[in-house]
Amino acid sequence: MYWEKALSEAERALAILPPSPKVSEFQNIRSLFPYIHTPSPLQEVSTEIQLNKIGAQLFILEDLTGSGKTESALTLAKRLMSSGRANGIFYALPTMATANAMYSRLVDVLSKLYLPGSKPSLILAHSRSRLMEGFTSKIWDNLLKGSSEFNNETPVYAGCASWFAESSKKALLADVGVGTIDQALMGVLQFRHNNLRLLGLEKKVFIVDEVHAYDAYM
């Protein structure tokens, strides 16, 4: 009885979600960030560094404040996605305030990661995400599929289906996410449904920002 009920609920959940977005080809850093006219040395490296053909990769980006580390990290992420090594991003930060600020920045980049016409989901993942109006205003209602709002006749781009936002354990399943580092760490700790978090991180570029500030939060 439970299995049949779970199957029907899973089908209903999948019917709500838009199809998986297709990643676009990487062109150059200005295609992601038009305001960059002269890339910094770190940003140039992010567009040129060789990617391994197989296996996981670790990149450590360290530079002065204002050197464009965020743009460099997202450029590398875009290159990894375009080469077929990933299909999404999770951007981890130490605090809810820094995650909120990064969410606003990712809204502008999201459409440039995927092909035109795609509807990738962007989630803000932390325990107080519902208090950020910039996020809650972009949550698609479960009944919106096929409606004028979902179909972009009313602009709600760079949002996510409410199914993702109902629970933090499902948040990492969105195509692109930004949140506090604990949302990812709970995937490897003894929390309920930790395997669901790991599934959400699979095939994603995992960016850890502000590393120097994590001691107080881990």
Task: Specify the residue positions occupied by each region the protein language model found.
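N-terminal helicase ATP-binding lobe
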Residues: 1-218
